[in-house]
């Protein structure tokens, strides 16, 4: 029933809310604080005369005062000092909004604060106004068609105050004020100034104001449910102006208060309840007034001031606001977040799927103090108790949602409802753990809450939990975290519980020890034992929660009072200390020389495995494995009921199951674990059933095959598996490094965090074997070949570390093994080198292969050539000879200092600098000739004619192409064969074997039978007519052609290898003149192309041999033999004084034509050492002369 300004009573179908502002400090920085001047009779006059049926129905087109002509005589409200502002509620369709102060409003976009339609029946209106007088004004928010409303601050500028227009606009219900054309004013204004609107909205969304400590101390948001009842004063206080526009001025919802919207499913609104006596005592207070509590809601805003202040899971504000408890419940976390439309709309969507639907609500009481439930006034203590619920569901829940009906507003959370003297004080867990939380009156707070749970700066109590029934949930989920987080910070350690299972404990445990599993903060309920937990399991399995409780139940009192730290070393030390106190060690730790019984170890380890397996598969645990929770301190210092130390568990079970072994099992050495040796005849198997697999209890027979220092490459799953299958398996033992490491891997188990069963099988056995290694000097077991084992580790992908051996005996053995290792490596590398050479000769080994790169990396870095490039050119031009005959018979070729004919001193037959394919061709072609010798191949490469220089520069095929004439037709049968006809000329490239040639015909290359062709003698060039040779004074000797020489001019003489030449005279130091006997061919030819075999006495003084230089640096090699008695023979021994002997360490392949080939262990006589690190010398093996890297040789 609503009453308009005229006093006429009329029925409404739409819901109406009457909001009465009280004396309040404004919490939003954007709203101006109201002063005393704002409460003028004008505002009161306008407030109570602006009610008409049209505005009551949402028709905010014009007011009744305007219709009666009162607009011209309205009071002047342009008080610039402190204009009064308020919040109004506007429907989702931008319906009529009213203001008690301002006649004009700025534009407001309906989409800016639009709310989901699913939350349409709950309206939460926070109000904060600074009013110093006792006068109050009413606001009325109307929702015509069930759409949502949002709080909009009103603002009045000076420009709008000066602008007064009276416009008669058509009436459109529900669209708000319109202009003369019928267009809503908000839409029109938004369209006219889109840029300003967007800029304003962007600033409002992204700006967070710092709270003002002086003005935001006493602002309490409260909640109204507009769909529950009709306000007795539902008339609209202030009519809407025709040119009203809407403009939100708050930076965020949290600045102006909290707008939290929740689903409302109550079908029937409760009847109206008369005001309570305490509310009627005040002249201005009514039953819809907010409670007389001053709560600083700004304290719950956890908006970080800077991104650098953000810490996940923490709130910098709440750190200063929670002086007593360091644990944040889910309610506190939800209150820390600013609410928004999106978070409110998505709160129910983000509810866990496993939670059942919310059950029918209990009528304990309504949420806010604006009203009470139907039967609440009749309950004992209801007049002095009001209910308040807080929202805490998911991280997306709104920040501060107070007020509203419990059936609508109470979220899925576990909270406690305890009415003093009320029969409905039992715990209730309906639906998704939803309960009502009653906040006692101020007079009873000190009695009810004795544990310091009150807020320092708040009078309202904020306490509940997400999944707990009675006590706050600890954040840590492992033993280590409990020790780190809880020491000195929790008021009573014995009341802490681990997880949901321990909180939702069964009936038996509650009856046996109610103080452990119930909250000490609710002594009324716990002392009377009247409440019983009724939990509806999220999982439909009946025994799920019971199993979950058994898996995670931990006695925290013993855990806190214990000195054991969650590390392997600490547990071992604690176990030893406990055993020493009980007198069970018998000099075990004191006497390290005592032998530990061998038969004790497998049994003891089996017991360990049994406990560890049970810890890993906790669902299989029985009731007998659960220790009763006791509050008494542990006796005998062992804490047998602690279930924290594996050693204590083992001690319990061994005393029960193995009384005879209980004494001996303590003899196991508890020193640091290392290696273990268990043979096949002592394979221990546990006497009890394994939960995972029986084979985990078997020790591997190959536990001693690998003796490698442990490394950290094993994953947790591998560690979890191999730690049980092998006591010293390479994977299992690799995870635990040494005993001084206080960190260890987590087990893969059903428990989160570190499980108490973190002491594994192999650590126990390795601990025992460490004692045996220290006490008994066993003979060294014969290992496999150390060289092979070293190679195996080198090529293996498994990382390893060599042990540091300190004993002299082992050092001697290591020294002995070093030679075999080096020998094995050297042999392997030699095989690799040979393989590379063979592959490179076949042309099948790319330069980027791994073997090639390996060899190149192992070889020394070749120094860059600089001064050695000119080392062979610095000698005088007239230093032609350096005879080096070996044994006086076979004379050595020397370099010739001919700059135009640089030799290719490549005597390396395996690798050619240009192409390995061509190097093979050279040898094949030379095999066709009858003059092949051991040096024929190298001689071919060191051919020093002009044509050789040309051919060496890129056309080596010209040298090896030998013409042949086809004597038969040959038709290719395969793609590799070469077809030709009789009479064709075929150029032979190389000889494949005794029956096949490879040749070229008409640009095609292929193979053909040797018998099908006949080699042709290359035609000699036609030499022009020349004058007859002069009369020879006489022959100076005889020589044999070493290489083929093709004449380029008509004065030169072409030579074939092996031709006998009569030397006529010495033209200069580089050229001879001679003739071939039996022919009329005569001409000059290079000295280096022939080998003098006979020298006559007369005629040889024309160009005498120069003396041997001290530092020979000639770049050409000559052959010179002399049988003159007066000339000494330069044998190999004669030149040793001229060079310093060096031995080659590595093979070196020449890269330039003046470089010398080196093979490993070659002896080289070094004549000169260049500044760039290159040496100049002669190889004693090949008798060639050239440069080579100095770091490839060592001094003999």
From Swiss-Prot:
Record domain SH3: where: 959-1018, 1034-1095, 1137-1196
Subcellular location: Cytoplasm, Perinuclear region; Apical cell membrane; Cell junction, Focal adhesion; Cell projection, Lamellipodium
Principal subcellular localization: cytoplasm
A Pfam family per the record: SH3_9
Gene Ontology MF terms: protein domain specific binding
GO biological processes: acetylcholine receptor signaling pathway; cell growth involved in cardiac muscle cell development; Notch signaling pathway; regulation of skeletal muscle acetylcholine-gated channel clustering
Post-translational modification as stated in the protein's UniProt record: Ubiquitinated by CBL.
Biased composition, class Basic and acidic residues, residue ranges: 252-262, 276-312, 948-958
Residue ranges with Low complexity bias: 382-399
Subunit structure: Interacts with ABL1/c-Abl, ABL2/v-Abl/Arg, ACTN, CBL and PALLD. Interacts with ABL, CBL, DNM1, DNM2, FLOT1, AFDN, PTK2B/PYK2, SAPAP, SPTAN1, SYNJ1, SYNJ2, VCL/vinculin and WASF. Interacts with PTPN12 and WASF1 via its SH3 domains; this interaction may mediate the partial PTPN12 and WASF1 translocation to focal adhesion sites.
Protein name: Sorbin and SH3 domain-containing protein 2
Gene of this entry: Sorbs2
